[in-house]
Amino acid sequence: MGGSDFEDDELFKDLYGEENEKKVESASGNQETSNVTPTKENEGYEELEKSGEAGAERTKENPFREEPGADFDRSGSDQQYSAEAEANQEDDLNETSQQAPDPSSYDIRGQALSSATWDNAEDGENSKNDNYNENQSALTGSGAMESNEDNAEETSPFNREDGKMFIGGLNWETTDDSLRDYFEQFGEVLDCTVMRDSTTGRSRGFGFLTFKNPKCVNEVMSKEHHLDGKIIDPKRAIPREEQEKTAKMFVGGVPGDCTEEEFRNFFNQFGRVLDATLMMDKDTGRPRGFGFVTYENESAVEATMSQPYITIHGKPVEVKRATPKASLRDSHDRHQHGYHGNANPYYAQNMNMYGGMTPAMMAQYYRQMQQYMEAMRNMPAAAGAVPYPQPVMPAGMADWQQQQQQGAAYFDPSKMNQGTGDGVPFSPSMPSGSSRGGYHGRNPGGPNRQRYRGRRDGRGGNTGGGHSFHPYRR
């Protein structure tokens, strides 16, 4: 065996292992004993035939072992094969079926994959890898997660309420757009609304807006604002349900030179103040002399109420608990429906409507009044000093009449049948403030009584006999 054959054997061992050493020796032995002198035409064919026989034996032992390339030259020299030799190689391999198969070209069931199937499988594997990479980047991408968390914080319902503000003292001409344009200098505004009357469509002088970032609220409240020629009053909006839970106080008699900041700082000594507001006149912008303070808890209210005297700028002020409007409405309803005929709703309704009198009582009273007025028209002039029997006022009518008059002539039921002192019996239907006897005071017969200053004759009302002027006297 020559030097080239030895080098061939060593290289073959490196590629295929020692187990095929015998096969290599047999193949090389056949090559030595061959008497055929290779020519340029059949040189490649013979080499391929030999390699095909050796490959057939190796395939029986291990069908998945890889074969060296077709251009491998056992003699160590590079051989250039013609197109005819390559065609013969393909025919020989197809006839003998001795070429080792590629393991990657078989599926899990051992069936060969076509080129189209293999391409599809590669595409599917690539798509799976792409999806996996995308999922991993979505799960591990810190930048994306942080941005999503920021967006969730900014748009969460809780933070949205924190960014809401009440804007008071608006000009009647201020619109939604002008209000939004002004406050967008402090941050992004999610929504903005000027409240309007549902009937007339006119502005009610206040509105609401919501910032995307709640921190903008503090910046807005730290400055004074002028919009459309008026000083506006922005406040942090407190939800209605939270207003009922918080401890709110009314403060009256606040000096006009007290600013809202001084007002807040003064009440901070009793507890943490959530909101402090001085009410302003919508037209003039001047303080109205009262305001409201909202504490964080009830203990601050108790501490404020425990002070015997509270003075601001040397002027005493009045402090008391603020009652929510809902509680005031409930109290009013209980007052209207809780004191009259709880067992009979119809009776209670009539009592409220007629000032404590049922329809039957009212009908009886008006019949007596008609009889009384008829007698007054038919009464002779000389009988002016004799009082005519008056109708008896039903029970409860006195209270009702006092409520209707509200500061008019005082009515005493015990003097109903005693007349007025002017020679004219008292008439319940006579309007308050009438010119009866020139009377304009509050207490008949009292020190404020004023008499008629007319002509001092028979028609003008003489001063004798204790009688004053009467319009029916002729």
Curated annotation (Swiss-Prot):
Alphabetical list of SMART domains matching this protein: RRM
Broad class of where this protein is predominantly found: nucleus
Domain of life, per lineage: Eukaryota
Basic and acidic residues bias locations: 12-25, 40-76
Listed PROSITE patterns: RRM
CDD domains: RRM1_Hrp1p, RRM2_Hrp1p
Protein name, per record: Uncharacterized RNA-binding protein C660.15
Extent of Low complexity compositional bias: 425-434
